[in-house]
């Protein structure tokens, strides 16, 4: 470990310890300080276990908790961020809370909720094995800017990523990312079968209306919600993806 990384870990651990002694939350502040003094602070940690990241506009916290519960039920030691500190600073603080004085993180899996815009930042410095991408909606525009800009940011990261990518086949903005890296053979899709609340009538939404490859208006067999549903492009054939995992008989009553 370099002297700079050693200082980063020791200083960070002292901050966490001090905050705990004062009865204060160490959720985000230590990571914010470390990012200020060392932009490569995540590289100071030694994480030898697989990292699973969950991202998307909606549902990150729930899916992260589901996956963590599944792994823990199998007897695995899990480190996760159930309270949603999902920015680079929050993830840095999480690792500080769980590492030893040499920056070593001991677990069977890290399951990390991660803000979409921070995926490239965090996982250019941590060795990610699996990225789960749920959806893209416009309800975070005030924070992340135009949704297409955000999608392209994630796409650029995926162009060189060769780990597992788990994508929502029912969201055209997510499904398109399965083609970001033609050399990655670890692309997997999931889907939710039509449920009782689905409709044949389109929602008034901007995202997911046109094919991302040929700009033709997409045809939907049905809409689950907003632009999420069974879709295909009548011109280039994008869509109608056969998922590896499909959730059936969804009962929301």
Show the residue positions of the predicted features.
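Phosphate-binding loop of NTP-binding sites
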Residues: 2-191, 198-213
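Adenine nucleotide phosphate-binding catalytic loops in nucleotide-utilizing enzymes
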Residues: 188-253
């Amino acid at each position: 470990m370099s002297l700079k990384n050693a200082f980063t870990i020791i200083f960070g651990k002292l901050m966490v310890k001090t905050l705990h002694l004062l009865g204060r939350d160490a959720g985000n502040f230590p990571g914010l300080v470390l990012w200020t003094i060392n932009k490569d602070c995540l590289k100071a940690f030694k994480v030898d276990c697989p990292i699973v990241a969950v991202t998307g506009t909606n549902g990150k916290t729930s899916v992260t908790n589901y996956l963590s519960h599944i792994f823990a039920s199998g007897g695995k030691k899990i480190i996760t961020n159930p309270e949603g500190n999902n920015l680079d600073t929050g993830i840095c603080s999480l690792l500080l809370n769980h590492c030893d004085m040499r920056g070593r993180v001991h677990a069977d899996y890290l399951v990390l909720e991660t803000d979409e815009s921070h995926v490239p930042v965090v996982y250019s410095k941590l060795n990610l094995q699996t990225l789960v991408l749920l959806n893209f909606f416009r309800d975070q525009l005030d924070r992340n800017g135009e949704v297409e800009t955000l999608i392209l940011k994630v796409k650029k990261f995926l162009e060189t990523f060769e780990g597992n990518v788990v994508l929502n086949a029912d969201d055209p903005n997510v499904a398109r990312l399965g083609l970001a890296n033609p050399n990655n053979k670890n692309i997997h899709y999931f889907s939710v079968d039509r449920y009782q609340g689905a409709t044949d009538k389109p929602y008034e939404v901007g995202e997911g209306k046109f094919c991302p490859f040929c700009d033709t208006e997409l045809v939907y067999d049905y809409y689950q919600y907003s632009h999420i549903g069974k879709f295909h492009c009548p011109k280039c054939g994008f869509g109608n993806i056969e998922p590896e995992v499909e959730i059936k008989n969804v009962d929301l009553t």
